Amino acid sequence: DGATFLLCETKSMDSASRKIVLEMIQLLNSKEVWIDRIHHDEIISITSHLPHLISTALVGTAKDNYEINEIMGMAAGGFDGATRLTRTNPEMIKDMYDTNSENINKFLKYFLDELMDLMDLQERDELISYLNNSVHWRRALSEKFGERPLS
């Protein structure tokens, strides 16, 4: 209820098919957003697929370096929030990767470059500036669209 459905037209889509989809969305009290398939795949790789892989990598880093009791004895909201996506069905993650690997790999490389840039920040002021830019952007996102509950 109230969800947004991102829809991509295909060459084979006719007006009857489109009408059925729109009626289903209306029955769910949701809204539709039509988006180009290529643009959709790029954005979804950042907003959905990449977070799953980052979450999984963080779990792998913790698992490979510490015993579970050590991690859980010290883990708090940050670890829980950052690794929540790792509970997702692995088959679904594999399917996401298989269908969008080109975009995922492109933005995974960009993400790795961001991490390397972060590691290179030696001056406190540089780090504060980097963090402030991210905080301001994320807060603006929340102000514009609100906070969604964690599920």
Across the structure, where does each feature detected by a protein language model lie?
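An alpha-helix initiation/capping motif
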Residues: 37-44, 48, 128-132
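Short, amphipathic C-terminal "tail helix"
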Residues: 132-151
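Amphipathic alpha-helical interaction surfaces
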Residues: 53-56, 88, 117, 140, ...
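Interdomain hinge/lid region at the active-site interface
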Residues: 68-138
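Substrate/ligand-engaging "lid" and interaction regions
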Residues: 32, 43-79, 83-84
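Rossmann-fold dinucleotide-binding core
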Residues: 1-35, 41
